[in-house]
């Protein structure tokens, strides 16, 4: 999978440069996320160029996002096209995933989740 990688201070933006994403391509994506996430824990996936995604690939994105959250990291998908959104809706993933209309809103989600994690860590520390 061809990806544009833009590293910011607290997160990385990954932009697939393919118009179609298949399940095979998400394996490449998962490998790249694994390598990027150890340095910068939060990832924004900008899907503005993706016009078609197969169902297995959509499921894989959901699994990858769950893996991020299990490790106290964040992954937000943004700028999905209508046809791609239809696949996520059909698979009932749209409400389970962090998907935003714009990249700016994705950044906001990442910041809010980081604050939430800090507050929860402080709360947990008080309980001990």
Question: For each of these PLM feature ranges, what is it?
Answer:
Residues 1-6, 118-128:
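Non-catalytic signal-transmission and effector/linker regions of two-component phosphorelay proteins
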Residues 2-34, 47-49:
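STAS-typified acidic loop motif
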Residues 6, 78, 100:
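General small-molecule cofactor/ligand-binding pocket signal
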Residues 15, 99-101:
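Structural signal for conserved beta-strand scaffold positions within catalytic alpha/beta enzyme cores
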Residues 18, 81, 103:
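Short, flexible active-site-adjacent loop segments at beta-strand->alpha-helix junctions, enriched
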Residues 23, 87, 109:
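Residues that scaffold the ATP/ADP-binding catalytic core of kinase and kinase-like folds
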Residues 26-32, 36-97:
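Amphipathic alpha-helical interaction surfaces in cytosolic regulatory modules
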Residues 101-125:
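A charged, well-structured terminal subsegment
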